[in-house]
A protein has these predicted regions:
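Secretory targeting and sorting signals
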Residues: 1-34
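Gly/Ser-rich "nucleophile elbow"/oxyanion-hole loop immediately N-terminal to the catalytic nucleophile
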Residues: 105-150, 158-162, 287
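Hydrolases whose catalytic domains are alpha/beta-hydrolase-1, hotdog thioesterase
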Residues: 151-155, 213
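Short beta-strand element of the alpha/beta-hydrolase
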Residues: 60-69
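N-terminal cap/lid segment of alpha/beta-hydrolase-fold proteins
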Residues: 32-60
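The feature captures the conserved acid-bearing segment of alpha/beta-hydrolase catalytic domains
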Residues: 167-240
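Short amphipathic alpha-helix adjacent to the substrate-entry channel of hydrolases
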Residues: 75-98
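Alpha/beta-hydrolase-fold serine-hydrolase catalytic core, especially in secreted/extracellular enzymes
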Residues: 237, 246-308
């Protein structure tokens, strides 16, 4: 969960499950190029169990660390992660357990970025790894959901702070871009948006049906994001769990706002725009054209606001 949804997580009683989904009538077209096959394997990153998704072909692949929502198991992001990997990323999705305000659970923290850089270097050097000599060790990008999104935003400033880190620490020099879903920088228990003094590009993907991290909160955070490039990419019909394999994963605070876009369409849309944003910020001219020119017009479910 993000800063705002942390107050929801702290409740001991949770609301009933969300209303039934309504299947969307429109499906956004995929980019013209065919996606490569993707494989996966289990590993550990600094002691955390992690799933790694990667294209079966290609070299010098940048690493994308995915920071989970609070108490959302990594398995719930398998479709999103595999889709993101199909665009040419090594996607690492760890389960990170720690104690936060006296409660133990799945809570990501900024130190994971540095751990992932170390893991990537070791994996690239490991002859037994399927990623041996295939990783771009100099490029790290972040994707995050909810609390993981807020953690990624904290890292985007160059200095991760509590509660998004156990202790304050700096972002690794390899970090080049951030994309979030269902994230904001609203001060817990208030409607006050804190400024994001980012030093790397940040893209906010926002479900317009999100009842946990609302569109107004996301837009307020975007408006107070000082560094550029930045983008606010709204997705019609997705709620807080539009990025997961299914609605309201077990253990996580539910979103009672109903999603109206088909779940599979929502996940594909969020993953595609995540990939295109990250590629655009790491040197792809085709992705820049997609993000800033053609993608919005081609996707009936998405509206993009940006500052280059």
């Amino acid at each position: 969960m993000n800063v705002t949804s942390f107050r929801s997580w702290k409740r001991t009683a949770v609301a009933a499950t969300a209303a039934a989904l309504v299947t969307a009538l429109t499906v956004a077209p995929a980019p013209a190029s065919a996606s490569p096959a993707v494989a996966s394997y289990a590993t550990t990153i600094n002691g955390d169990s992690a799933d790694v998704y990667y294209p079966v072909t290609g070299t010098r692949l940048p690493v994308a660390l995915f920071l989970q929502g609070a108490n959302v198991d990594k398995s719930n992001y398998s479709t999103y992660a595999a889709t993101l990997a199909s665009y040419g990323f090594v996607v690492a999705v760890p389960n990170h357990t720690r104690s936060l305000f006296g409660t133990s659970g799945l809570f990501p923290e900024g130190a994971q970025a540095g751990w992932t850089v170390d893991w990537a270097e070791a994996e690239d050097d490991n002859p037994a790894s399927p990623l041996h000599k295939r990783i771009d060790e100099n490029t790290l990008v972040l994707s995050g959901h909810s609390f993981g999104a807020a953690t990624a935003l904290s890292l985007s400033t160059g200095l991760c702070i509590i509660p998004f880190c156990s202790i304050a620490n700096t972002a690794p020099g390899e970090l080049e871009a951030v994309v979030t879903y269902g994230g904001n920088y609203i001060l817990s228990g208030t409607s006050i948006a804190l400024p994001v003094l980012n030093t790397v590009p940040v893209g906010y993907i926002q479900g317009l049906a999100d009842g946990v991290a609302t569109p107004d909160e996301g837009l307020s955070t975007y408006n107070l994001t000082t560094g550029t490039p930045k983008a606010f990419i709204s997705v019609t019909g997705t709620n807080h769990y539009g990025v997961t394999n299914g609605q309201n994963p077990a253990g996580a605070a539910p979103d009672t706002s109903a999603q109206t876009l088909d779940q599979a369409v929502g996940v594909e849309t969020i993953a595609r725009w995540s990939a295109q944003w990250l590629l655009a910020q790491t040197g792809s001219s085709a992705a820049r054209k997609y993000v800033y020119t053609t993608g919005d017009a081609a996707d009936p479910n998405v509206t993009v606001t940006y500052v280059k």
